[in-house]
């Protein structure tokens, strides 16, 4: 299998629950290397830009409001088949459908406040990583 990079967000509701370390531990236990991470508080402009593909949908304004309601943690994860494996670890977008033991089953509050985000493709991951990380902010780990 190919080594891939994927993008992850720990959303404001999960940050507020003080479970960042628990989530990182689960990433590492699943075999991911964390090769980039930072905490930030999105501006409305940043949130609208990141979620631009959803503009015009009924949930867009609520999503922007939620994503700007508190700090988030953005990360780049590396590993074999990283995009799909990360999505499997997150669980279904709607936490009501998330399997027990997934991050969304454990940390989500609702469909919008589902605790986490993960890229849905290698192409999306590259775009999302570039949105938040400048050249040199992602550090390859060879050891």
Curated annotation (Swiss-Prot):
Family recorded in the similarity comment: Belongs to the NDK family.
Keywords (A to Z) from UniProt: ATP-binding, Cytoplasm, Kinase, Magnesium, Metal-binding, Nucleotide metabolism, Nucleotide-binding, Phosphoprotein, Transferase
SMART domains for this protein: NDK
Active site: 117 (pros-phosphohistidine intermediate)
Source organism of this protein record: Klebsiella pneumoniae subsp. pneumoniae (strain ATCC 700721 / MGH 78578)
Residues that coordinate or bind ATP: 11, 59, 87, 93, 104, 114
Coiled coil feature spans: none
GO biological process annotation, one example: UTP biosynthetic process
Cofactor(s), by name: Mg(2+)
Protein name (Swiss-Prot/TrEMBL): Nucleoside diphosphate kinase
Cellular component GO terms, alphabetical: cytoplasm
InterPro entries: NDK-like_dom, NDK-like_dom_sf, Nucleoside_diP_kinase, Nucleoside_diP_kinase_AS
CDD domains named among the record's database cross-references: NDPk_I (cd04413)
Subcellular location: Cytoplasm
Subunit structure: Homotetramer.
Function according to Swiss-Prot or TrEMBL: Major role in the synthesis of nucleoside triphosphates other than ATP. The ATP gamma phosphate is transferred to the NDP beta phosphate via a ping-pong mechanism, using a phosphorylated active-site intermediate.
Originating gene: ndk
Keyword Zinc attributed: no
Top-rank taxon, per record: Bacteria
NCBIfam families: PRK00668.1
Enzyme class: transferase
Pfam families in UniProt: NDK
One MF annotation (Gene Ontology) recorded for this entry: metal ion binding
Catalytic activity line of the entry: a 2'-deoxyribonucleoside 5'-diphosphate + ATP = a 2'-deoxyribonucleoside 5'-triphosphate + ADP; a ribonucleoside 5'-diphosphate + ATP = a ribonucleoside 5'-triphosphate + ADP
